[in-house]
């Protein structure tokens, strides 16, 4: 159904006293323009990562995604306070430039002289509670596209959540022809284009763009776990990975007439998320969640079950509730093994080829782990030395998150969709 509830959730603080962002980082995020709602800003913070390192402050793809969610989580607590006073208090050195939330600017002297807003962690707000958003459905949609992506990242302490749905009825109309237009394009390129389309105008529930986005997501995830490939396609389509297990995987939309999988009738869906911290360095997983956010901005997806999220994320209207869909987690490295096992069983990959892919995946995981743990240590040292200017460059994680998790069960659940 079409979305009727426009709630969003802000970040947790990861053990800090305040939102983990400081003046230097906020200035860096807004250097291209003062409006966080600009399409270019949005596409920047979901698509960085074509190279693994970008800058000292934004070291990887997941950094800007997390940092922008911190910036919005802090600054939006200004207008969402009781009585909706938008310009009488600052977050860091920033205030909104107008009640319409057009942009963020340095606060005037009289506001700078007053204490900054002490934002709260894990807050849930409703866009319709702020009059200027409630009155302008088009602007609310544009804002909510981004706030949906923020929510999908912050419902749990792990990586961003994606929605995967398989339903033969989605292929009706001109979707198949539109999908052919993307033949030979990468998943990242397709996702980027669809995000632009969503920002330009709201998608109708189960309209052409909404259905095509869900098909693209299902093709990606079924390919990601090795269920579909050149010998077992989904209506001739699948995503081919150039170097599975590499630090920067590229997934290309491909076609094959060899064999098409038999798809059971009916509508089946699930939610999936990476639980290992190396999602921060995988732009495909980030873009998958962002496409899910585009869907959420116009459509009400199934609820995520309360038991799949921490207490602070339960019973959020339109997002989580009792008897909802289970949220399936996986370790990025372990999913490479699941992928290889399926391709080998289907005769697409030899044991020797699997050994090569898994050796590369081991090297990639160690490289990413070394980088992420180094940045985390540096951030901890910085925060101890600067208690009044704390920040995290990547979403906080624990060593336990590098474990295998429920990867096998998640892989089987995705495979069961067809």
Swiss-Prot record:
Nucleotide-binding listed as a keyword: no
InterPro entries: Sigma_1_2_reovir (IPR004317)
Pfam families: Sigma_1_2
Main location as per UniProt: virion
Localization (cell): Virion
Keywords: Capsid protein, Inner capsid protein, Virion
Misc note: Mutant ts447 is temperature-sensitive.
Function comment: Inner capsid (core) component.
Similarity comment text for this entry: Belongs to the orthoreovirus sigma-1 protein family.
Protein name per UniProt: Inner capsid protein sigma-2
Annotated gene: S2
């Amino acid at each position: 159904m079409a979305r009727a509830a426009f709630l969003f959730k802000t970040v947790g603080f990861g053990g800090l006293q305040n939102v983990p962002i400081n003046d230097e980082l906020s200035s860096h995020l807004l250097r291209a323009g003062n409006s966080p709602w600009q399409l270019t800003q949005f596409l920047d913070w979901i698509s960085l990562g074509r190279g693994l390192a970008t800058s000292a402050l934004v070291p990887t793809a997941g950094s800007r995604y997390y940092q922008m969610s911190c910036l919005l989580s802090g600054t939006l607590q200004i207008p969402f306070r009781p009585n909706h006073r938008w310009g009488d208090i600052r977050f860091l050195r920033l205030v909104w430039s107008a009640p319409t939330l057009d942009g963020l600017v340095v606060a005037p002297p009289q506001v700078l002289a007053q204490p900054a807003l002490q934002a709260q962690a894990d807050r849930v707000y409703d866009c319709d509670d702020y009059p200027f958003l409630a009155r302008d459905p088009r602007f609310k949609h544009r804002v909510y596209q981004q706030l949906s992506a923020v929510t999908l990242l912050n419902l749990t302490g792990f990586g961003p959540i994606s929605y995967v749905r398989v339903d033969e009825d989605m292929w009706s109309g001109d979707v198949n022809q539109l999908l052919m237009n993307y033949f030979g394009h990468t998943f990242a390129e397709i996702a980027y284009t669809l995000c632009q389309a969503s920002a330009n105008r709201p998608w109708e529930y189960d309209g052409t763009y909404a259905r095509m986005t869900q098909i693209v997501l299902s093709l990606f995830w079924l390919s990601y776990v090795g269920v579909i490939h050149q010998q077992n396609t989904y209506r001739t389509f699948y995503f081919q990975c150039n170097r599975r297990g590499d630090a920067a995987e590229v997934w290309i939309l491909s076609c094959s007439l060899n064999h098409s999988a038999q798809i059971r009738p009916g509508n089946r869906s699930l939610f999936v998320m990476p639980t290992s911290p190396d999602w921060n360095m995988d732009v495909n997983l980030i873009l998958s969640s962002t496409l899910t956010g585009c869907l959420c901005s116009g459509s009400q997806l199934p609820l995520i079950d309360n038991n799949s999220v921490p207490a602070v994320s339960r019973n959020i209207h339109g997002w989580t509730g009792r008897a909802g869909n289970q949220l399936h987690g996986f370790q990025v490295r372990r999913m490479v093994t699941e992928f290889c096992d399926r391709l080998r069983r289907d005769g697409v990959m030899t044991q020797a080829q699997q050994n090569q892919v898994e050796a590369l995946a081991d090297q990639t995981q160690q490289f990413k782990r070394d980088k992420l743990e180094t940045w985390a240590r540096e951030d901890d040292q910085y925060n101890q030395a600067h208690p009044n200017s704390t920040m995290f460059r990547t979403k906080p994680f624990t060593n336990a998150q590098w474990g295998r998790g429920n990867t096998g069960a998640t892989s089987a659940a995705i495979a069961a969709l067809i």
